[in-house]
Amino acid sequence: MTNITSSFLCLLILLLFCLSFGYSLHGDKDEVLSVDVGSNAKVMKHLDGDDAMKKAQVRGRSGQEFSKETTKMMMKKTTKKETNVEEEDDLVAYTADYWKPRHHPPKNN
């Protein structure tokens, strides 16, 4: 009987200990999640504010005017530098790193 009560008390203490130092499953309101993701895909960035939506006045030959709403979108440049290496079927001299030699333009000195 004492063995059962002592094991029950140990489990109860362990449960209270886990609950007191536990973490919230849904997160706190003040927590900020930050994830760095590397990608070389092009991303469309939408401008906020008055710059994004503009009304342009369009006038035809007949003199009638009408307004056209335009949306301005900007392309974000890729962060990874792309290199163009021409594929050659010729034999390449053996090098330790197995890279083909690249042909660079001459320096302008």
From Swiss-Prot:
Q: Any transmembrane segments, and where? A: none
Kindly state one GO CC term assigned in the UniProt record.
Answer: extracellular space
- Single Gene Ontology MF annotation: growth factor activity
Record-listed Hydroxyproline modification sites: 106
Signal peptide positions are 1-24
Gene Ontology BP terms:
cell differentiation; cellular response to phosphate starvation; positive regulation of cell population proliferation; regulation of asymmetric cell division; regulation of lateral root development; regulation of root development; regulation of root meristem growth; regulation of root morphogenesis
Region Disordered, as annotated, extends over 54-88
Quick check: keyword Lyase in the entry?
no
Q: What induces it?
A: Accumulates in both root epidermis and cortex after Pi- deprivation.
Q: Does the keyword Secreted apply?
A: yes
Q: Which residues form the propeptide?
A: 25-96
Q: Which residues carry this modification: Sulfotyrosine?
A: 98
- Which keywords appear in this protein's UniProt record, sorted alphabetically? Differentiation, Growth factor, Hydroxylation, Secreted, Signal, Sulfation
| Annotated tissue distribution | Expressed in root tips.
Free-text disruption phenotype from the record: No visible phenotype, due to the redundancy with other RGF genes. Slower root growth after (Pi)-deprivation. Triple mutant rgf1-rgf2-rgf3 shows a decreased meristematic cell number resulting in a short root phenotype associated with an altered PIN2 traffic.
Q: What else is known?
A: 'Golven' means irregular waves in Dutch.
The family this protein is said to belong to? Belongs to the RGF family.
Q: What is this protein called?
A: Protein GOLVEN 5
User: Native species of this protein?
Assistant: Arabidopsis thaliana
